[in-house]
Amino acid sequence: MCRISGEPMKKLLERLLWKQDPNVYMAKDSKLTPSLRTIDLIGLGTGMVVGTAIFTLPGIVAAEHTGPAVPLAFIVAAIGAGLSALAYAETSSVLPFAGSAFSWINVLFGEFFGWIAGWALLAEYFISVAFVASGWSAYMQGFLGSLGIRLPKALTGGFDPAHGSYVDILAALAILVVGILISQGLHQVSRIENTIVAIKLLVILMFIVVGATEIQAKNYVPFIPPHRPGTTFGGWQGILAGTAQIFIAYVGFDAIAANTAETRNPQKTMPRGLIGTLVLGTGFFIAVSLVLVGMFKYSRYANNAEPAAWALRHSGHYLTANLLSVVAIIGIFSALIAILLASSRLIYAFGRDGLLPKTLGVINDQHVPSHALWLITFLAMILGSVFPFTFLATLVSAGTLVAFIFVSLGIYALRPREGKDLPEAQFKMPWYPVLPAVSAIFSAVIFWGLNIDAKILMVGWFAIGLIIYFAYGLRHSIINQEHQK
């Protein structure tokens, strides 16, 4: 009796671990045009990394978790992201497919684990689109307010009847405009992105220089406030909580990897783009956050999604503040381009593999997965216009960390196959086999620092993912169809 009941379970477990042939991905992704260079990847990554979080998160994290020590949270997050970036760099140089961690884990560990990694990525990307649009809306409203233009209260934020807001109309419009832009083709998008990033970095440097003249040393004392029992503020507990929330800043290099199939010579170009983005972004994060908490006491940044422009206005630098707001509006818009682009490529990969309806894997005459693009665009419009900014930030970090853990552990399955049934890596994660484990543990510790609501919501998210996989994906996937032939 036990042997009979055990046989179906054994077959199911074997089925869940079926691995995809990398040549199948190479053939299906050949319709995508490889046009991205190193500078384009750094532009896309920096557009995301130095696009949203740098303009929106430092003030909120300082007020809610770290106090003046917010630069330490960025440094800790950078270490964790840097370790993961090394794993991403090696994996993307061997497996240059669309879909990033989803496709890689499918090849390395099997379809079930690939779906779990991909579902975590979808939480990261999908919610990131809404988060970025929400931050863009906050800056746009601040800029319009400085000109005496104010939207009706009901249209200025997520669904919060107690405070009179029902829908963030500007967030929804921003997502729609970016969806239209991306639908025109990747080459035009990358040119626009590079130009915006160059302007944005110049204005951030201007903020650092001007803001540094308003720093008051007393605002740094105490640099690490004492921990408040029962909260996630102060002490190293606060820094860990701040690090978990800040991790959203580093989804930029993850978004780069989603575009591997559209990259020229990805074996060399992708590692350069990943590491270049991380180094550049971290330097700007530390400088901006140090200046920001030095200008005003950290508590004054509570619930402020446009802290840099606010600090300049309240220190008398109105012209610079307005210039920063304009560039932030444009710069965060560029981040929206990068993350919506990555989101559509992930949905395309799900459709390509049959785990979601195959129509999502269709590529049009402009070499764009248009069905996937418009699905994620309209869903993100709903999410970004209804949910509040800080709620979205925490959820994005949770999805990011799960993906980082999978890719770091994936090195153990990848390295033995390099130079055999997979190409030799052009870049290798150093100190193997120790560093991949350190990277995975680091991300797991930061995940543990997330608030309980984020963990509960992620459990719910994965429950939905498992239902979709067992109800649809398991039977309709291309792996299943190939084995039935």
Predicted regions and their residues:
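Membrane-interface "cap" regions at the ends of multi-pass membrane proteins
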Residues: 2-59, 63-68, 75, 81-86, ...
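Helix-loop-helix junctions that connect adjacent transmembrane segments
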Residues: 25-32, 71, 148-171, 195-326
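Select transmembrane alpha-helical segments in multipass membrane proteins
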Residues: 35-45, 110-123, 170-174, 231-246, ...
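Loop-to-transmembrane helix boundary motifs in multi-pass membrane proteins
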Residues: 38, 166-172, 264-285, 302, ...
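Hydrophobic transmembrane alpha-helices that form the core helical bundles
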Residues: 60-63, 72-73, 82-175, 180, ...
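Membrane-interface loop-to-helix entry segments
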Residues: 137, 166-217, 274-277, 393-406, ...
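Hydrophobic alpha-helical segments of multi-pass membrane transport proteins
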Residues: 142, 203-207, 347, 396-425, ...
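C-terminal membrane-solvent junction of multi-pass transporters and transport-like membrane proteins
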Residues: 163-167, 359-370, 404-455, 475-484
